[in-house]
Amino acid sequence: MNFKILLPICALLTLTTFLLTIIATAGSTSNYKPITNIYIGDADISKINVTKVMPQVGPILTVLGSALTAPNTTVDTIFGALKAIASTEALSPLLHLLSNAANTSATLSSLTQLAPMALLGTNTATTTTFSALDELLTTSKNTTELLDGFSTLMSSMSTNTSSTSASLENTVLTLLVDSTNPIGTTESLITLNNMTTEEKTKLSPVFELFASSKNITATCDALETIMNSTIPTSTVSSLFSSLKTSLAEGGNATETIMQLGSLVPSSLKPAVQAVVTLFDETTSQNVTLSVLSTMIAENITQSSSAKAAMGALTDLLNYTTNQTELLTSVESLALSKEAASSTNQLVALDEILSASANASTVVSIIPTLESQLANNTVLLKYVPYLFSLLAASSDPVSSFSSLVNITKWAETNAATFMPMLKILNSAVNMTTITPEQLKEMTPSILEYLHIPVIYRLSIFTMCRAHLNRTMYSCSKSHAVQNMDFRSIVYNNIEGSDFKPYMDALNIGKDDLHLDGELQDRQHMYVPAVKAALAMNLMCIITSFFLMVFLLLLSRRSVVSQKLWLALGFISCWICIFSGLGSTIFSVILNMMKSGSKKDNYDVIISGSSPFYGLMWSGFVFAVLVFLCIAYCWWSSRKGAAIVEAEKAVQESDSTTSRIIEEHESPIDAEKNFAR
């Protein structure tokens, strides 16, 4: 084919590459129509996994989504009621209550049951009760355990309303108030209370010894030593026989014991000394002898239950600040016939105190709390629902504080609160929605809240679009867009109707759980786009020069081999620039796609067909130009070889003729001359 035809064709194809690259680059750097449809890629968040990205919002959407499944309910119905309180002080506590729901069904059920209490308002007694309960929760280091214990305690109190039961409760609480170690005291009381009636009866002699003691601590230690010693029966018989004789004759029991003590083995010395202490610290040696004789006769000193009881009693005496009161109280508890209910309350108290960071403070709070609840019958019937709500919360302290704030607000804003209450009631009557159902609802919810769901990413701009892909707006052109997906999503949510709810829940940019492959790779995005943009610019520049070069050469009648090589060199670079630019942009897109897929946020990344169509078409045309130039160069080279060969033949023929002429004979020359 004539190169004069091929050169203009190559110029036209180069012009096409030039224009396609310019349009692709301009489309992805501008924000005016119609080239806004040309972009690198877009991110569709219409079905984003909200519960994963914003866990705080998950339970809220579950509640609202469940309400949406009710008959004749629309997004406007649900979120319209929520918008009505968006500017009030009730929004934050309500959202925190729902957000803290570890068990959505239990939370909803409890809230609807507690709603009448909120509408009734509060009085001084209710406020005092709430304050005490709030203080109790604040001191907790394990709120779940504390709530379980307090719930059990209240249940036990409500089922045991006898005066005896109330007296026992007061006795226990008094012991705890006087204790330097409320937890240790409670556990020791549980040990004593778990004993059978027969075992408790056997402890009566012990209390008789304490009643006649001048030093309760010394007496207790001495008894514990005796119980933990093994004394031969013969030694015991000899000891008590001598003591009876000595006391009958008006002698001193202590001296008698000391005389006998010198005759016993060293292993029994501590036990003998303990007996001496008992007689030294008593107000009546005869009473002490009688009690000890009874204890030995009934084998109390060797009883395992008695030994355990003595250990618990010793601990109680060590912890108390009033030993006399303690012994009286423990004796009354031991003689009580309501041991089972008392034990349940003690176990509940132990659970409460163990879950508290300050047991002494809790001990002072519980009597006040019990008293207020016992006297406030209106509030008392809501207590089970209150504990159910707090037990279903991941942060009971925050939930209780939120409930108190809502109660105060609803008291004076019942009309505004009622629509929201209806939504909660409708949600509690519906089956909790599944994650798949929530996913299908997400697009309509995002659209209602005016949150852009399509993000079109170009080189210098970011465009936001509705679900139907009509544009919200585009950013002004500036430096290469950063693929910081967290910032992109957060900034757009900040500009939507969802902002009040974000503020109410104190959700900041760093609270968005968008960590993963996509976010980790964002630092590679800007350098890659810059490199691709540089390739495009180089492609445009070299295409322009090649196009001009081709047009100029098309006017020549002959194109030398060197010029063809120059054309091929330039065309090769155009192919490289165009191919690299297209490849880098494709790699960027696939990088975002794979990152999004691995992160599993249900964000769909897709490329722009017009953009990649323009880029790769430009590359194909550049390759065609290179092939045409290569063909022309090859044809030119072959043509030059033929010309050289013909020239060589002509030169050879000319040389041959000259030689023949030089060797012609003189006769032939004369004949030729004659002619």
Curated annotation (Swiss-Prot):
Signal peptide (residue range): 1-28
PTM annotation, UniProt: N-glycosylated.
Modified residues (Phosphoserine): S654, S665
GO biological process: fungal-type cell wall organization
Positions of transmembrane segments: 533-553, 569-589, 611-631
Record has Ubl conjugation as a keyword: yes
Induction note: By anaerobic conditions.
GO cellular component, one term: fungal-type vacuole
UniProt main location, coarse: membrane
Record's keyword terms, sorted: Cell membrane, Glycoprotein, Isopeptide bond, Membrane, Phosphoprotein, Signal, Transmembrane, Transmembrane helix, Ubl conjugation
Topological domain ranges for the Cytoplasmic compartment: 554-568, 632-675
One Pfam short name: SUR7
Name this polypeptide is given: Cell membrane protein YLR413W
